[in-house]
Amino acid sequence: MAADWEEIRRLAADFQRAQFAEAAHRLSERNCIEIVTKLIAEKQLEVVHTLDGKEYVTPAQISKEIWDELSVCGGRINIVDLQQIINVDLLHIENRANDIVKSDKAVQLVLGQLINESYLDQLAEEINDKLQETGQVTISELCKAYDLPGDFLTQALSKRLGRIIHGRLDQENRGVIFTEAFVSRHRARIRGLFSAITRPTPVSNLITRYGFQEHLLYSVLEELVNTSRLKGTVVGGKQDKAVFVPDIYARTQSNWVDSFFKQNGYLEFDALYRLGIPDPAGYIKKRYKSTKLLFLRAACVGQEIVDRVEASVDEVISSGSWIDVATLLPSSLSVEDIGILLQQVMRSLNKNSSGLVFSDTIVVSEKFISSCTDLFSDMMKQKAEKEMKNSPVHLITEEDLKQSYVLENSYTNKKDKKDERRKKATEGSGSVRGGGGGNAREIKIKKTKKKGRKDADSDEESQATGTGRNKQLEFHFMSQEEMQDVLKTHLQDCPEELITELAEHLMRPLTKSYQEVVRSVFTSSTSSSGASGRQTMKDLQEEFSNLYNNIRLFEKGTKYFTDETQTNLAKHLLKTVCTDITNLIFNFLASDSMMTTENYSTITSEVRTKILGKLPEDTRGPLTKLHTSLNGKSLEDFLSYLDAAADICDIMVKKGDKKKERQVLFQHRQALIEQLKVTEDPALVLHLTAVLLFQFSTHCMLHAPGRSVPQIINFLSGKIPEDQHSLLIKYQGLVVKQLISQSKKAEQEDDNKTEEEEGADTIRKELQEITTSVKDLVLRPRKSSVTEE
């Protein structure tokens, strides 16, 4: 029992100790941070942690510390410095600084610095001390000294003028502050200096020499002049050109200007400038406000001179003569000024259509120009008649055709000699225009209608040609130098420069008139030669028929070859026989516009394009297609365009019959044989022999270029005996070697030709030995060879 009570007392004592014991549990730092973070997130607590993250600061504490630092620093502190002192992020410093500026009008935020009114008052006191010492201060100097913007400083100091700062701000140049004593001292200096001036003096020189403040000087000077304290005027504005002119000098100056103008009727700007007037034009306008003056580049003239020139020009225009206005005006006036004066006079007379200005100073009437034109009338007619006799061709002259032909020949001559010789051979084979014109059906040819034809030199016609080169050809009348010689003979009193410009002016109209005279002469000549034109119509019909049938027969011969060879043969036909028949049509159509040439084969692509530009719309389209197809590679297209062109020109094409074809084949073969007999050129012999053997084998004519000879020889394999074909192959190889050796010989130097010459001689001898045998393949065919029936 006693033990139980003892246990109870012990438990009671433990309970009592537990009741009176203190709690020893505390929150950890991490728990504190989490709690504060949660409170900040729920916006129940507004604090800012420091940059080192060890402390929290309230915004109110930041504001308090900013105020304290601003006071300690004398009313001006940089926000960046506050960040280092308060040890929080710059963003929080800026936010609190903006709040302080909004809440307190006495604090301003300028260029990242907090500035209060007490600092500005202290600043104004310092500036005032400096102002009283120097007499003037400039805002720009203060900006550099105190590191503050000019506008802010000007505004802050303006509020303290008269209160803290004893001075005034220059009203025209608000960047300077003066004291009254400084202004009075400068006014006295300016008054004394300008009172002593007796001649025009540039103000800028005085500023530099005596060290005046520029804006202050101009304002004081203007005040003294307006109050008549200084007798004079400032001309040229408030710039570097400003000049102070004393009244005594101005009166003398004005008297001279008035006297000169009264006596001469004009004023030179350069003379006034030498008198010390920096702005002569402005001075004259100001002095002679009510006087009617004409201002030129370097002078001005009075109405009296203008009236005198106007009367002289009017008389010249009425009498049909000319005059050099420079003789009526002062010699000091420049040519440019005289030209301006003349333009004004011509506008006032309103007779621009009756008179022209040459050389800037000479007025020439239209009547005088017409009389000069008449001097060339007889010359035009005589020259046109002479040209018609010497060159009875027309808007496309023989000379133009010759020039075009020479250009083409110059290009052809640059080719290899082999191609040149073979070209001659093919021209020989294609130039035979045989055919029984008597057996053919008559071809009816009628000239195209002229209805709707437009003038050849119209813009629309020019555009339709599709090239800027197809301009109407002009007959040359006279060169400008020749015209000058004629004018000098008849106008001996005219100056040289007038003769030159007059000839230049007449060049185009005289040339145009000459074209009309030539047209007239040629038209009369054409009408008189109509009978002879009808006489040649039959020849034209026969030649067209022969060419057309030849093209058809040559086309048959191309069908025996591969596509590539056919294309080459077609191109050659288009460049030769097809071009001939195209030129024949173009030459015939061109006769309507007096555009013919006796030798139509000399017509080039350029000349055909020019002829197209003269044709009416309904004819031009088909003829353009025909002209373009010559540059293609399809005989079918060309023949279809040829048929269309023949329909447009009312040329009825009749294909030849079998009898006529045999006759043409025979004539063509005989022509080639005759050519083969007389030639000794190995390349030409090979070419003619191959073409004749082809005709013997196929009974078809062939018009081929030299480069197609190997293909013809390959075709003959199996068509002629093997020994004949082998002879052709051998002869072909020798011809190729000869051409190669000739080419190398032309490229090598003279001292390296011995070996090449020996090889060439060997080849030449071999060719001479078998040339006769090759010719005999055609001239003396064996019975075993295939011959034409």
Swiss-Prot record:
InterPro entries: Ufl1 (IPR018611), Ufl1-like_C (IPR056761), Ufl1_dom (IPR056580), Ufl1_N (IPR056579). Belongs to the UFL1 family. The keyword Repeat does not apply. The lineage of its organism: Eukaryota, Metazoa, Chordata, Craniata, Vertebrata. Residues 748-760 have a biased composition (Acidic residues). GO terms for molecular function: UFM1 ligase activity; UFM1 transferase activity. Catalytic component of the UFM1 ribosome E3 ligase (UREL) complex. Interacts with E2-like enzyme UFC1. GO terms for cellular component: cytoplasm; cytosol; endoplasmic reticulum; endoplasmic reticulum membrane; nucleus; site of double-strand break. Pfam families: E3_UFM1_ligase, UFL1, UFL1_C. Residues 407-470, 743-763 are annotated as: Disordered. It is found in: Endoplasmic reticulum membrane; Cytoplasm, Cytosol; Nucleus; Chromosome. E3 protein ligase that mediates ufmylation, the covalent attachment of the ubiquitin-like modifier UFM1 to lysine residues on target proteins, and which plays a key role in various processes, such as ribosome recycling, response to DNA damage, interferon response or reticulophagy (also called ER-phagy). As part of the UREL complex, plays a key role in ribosome recycling by catalyzing mono-ufmylation of RPL26/uL24 subunit of the 60S ribosome. Its EC number is 2.3.2.-. This is E3 UFM1-protein ligase 1. Residues 444-453 have a biased composition (Basic residues). Keywords: Chromosome, Cytoplasm, DNA damage, DNA repair, Endoplasmic reticulum, Membrane, Nucleus, Transferase, Ubl conjugation pathway. It comes from the Eukaryota. Residues 2-212 are annotated as: Required for E3 UFM1-protein ligase activity. One of its GO terms (biological process) is DNA repair. Its main location: endoplasmic reticulum.
